[in-house]
């Protein structure tokens, strides 16, 4: 309908232009792919993040329903690889989770500890992303993490598992998207503290 005027309200790239963080929406998967550390979530910038995420394993109580045998309860068992949302890339995907855990936290001692550590890692990573997006308010006007739930029991980016259990990420997301956010950012040995508000009236605060 060339005679009808259309004005996009979200950041818009325009027809035929290449992907750019300066206009339009943006998908950020460099961390999940294993090519960047989780702190990269703080360094990227875009007008609108429409996809970004990080994986974790299922809760043990959910996992034992499809991996009841002890031999199945290994990160690289056939069952665990079948229940990895990246499919053909499952070995690498699970390996990346383990590598990021070892890069950021004490080594888990048990299989259960590894599952839990993956939840902490996922929550910490996405918290970095959300807070960075919100600190950049005015340039960045959208932040949609991937993903809310699962359609089957699987290791994935979801914040709620197939059984309906909230992972640590879901609690963090709820807090990180509150209408007021106090967020610290360290760079070049400097600590910057931001007060971000989505309320309609200006607000002041005192940092104690």
What are these regions (language model features)?
Residues 1-12, 16-17, 143:
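Active-site mouth of glycoside hydrolases
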């Amino acid at each position: 309908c060339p005679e009808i005027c259309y004005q996009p309200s979200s950041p818009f790239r325009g027809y035929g232009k290449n992907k750019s963080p300066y206009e339009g929406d943006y998908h950020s998967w460099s961390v999940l792919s294993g090519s960047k550390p989780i702190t990269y979530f703080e360094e990227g910038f875009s007008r609108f993040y429409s996809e970004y995420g990080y994986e974790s394993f299922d809760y043990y109580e959910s996992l034992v329903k499809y991996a009841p045998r002890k031999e199945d309860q290994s990160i690289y068992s056939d069952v665990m690889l079948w229940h990895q949302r990246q499919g053909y890339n499952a070995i690498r995907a699970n390996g990346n989770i383990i590598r990021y855990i070892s890069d950021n936290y004490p080594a888990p001692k048990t299989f259960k500890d590894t599952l839990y550590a993956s939840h902490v890692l996922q929550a910490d990573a996405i918290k970095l992303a959300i807070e960075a997006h919100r600190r950049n308010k005015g340039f960045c006007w959208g932040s949609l993490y991937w993903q809310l739930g699962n359609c089957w029991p699987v290791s994935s980016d979801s914040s709620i598992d197939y059984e309906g259990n909230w992972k640590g990420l879901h609690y963090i997301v709820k807090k990180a998207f509150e209408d007021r956010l106090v967020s610290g950012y360290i760079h070049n040995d400097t600590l910057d503290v931001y007060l971000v508000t989505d309320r309609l009236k200006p607000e002041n605060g005192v940092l104690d």
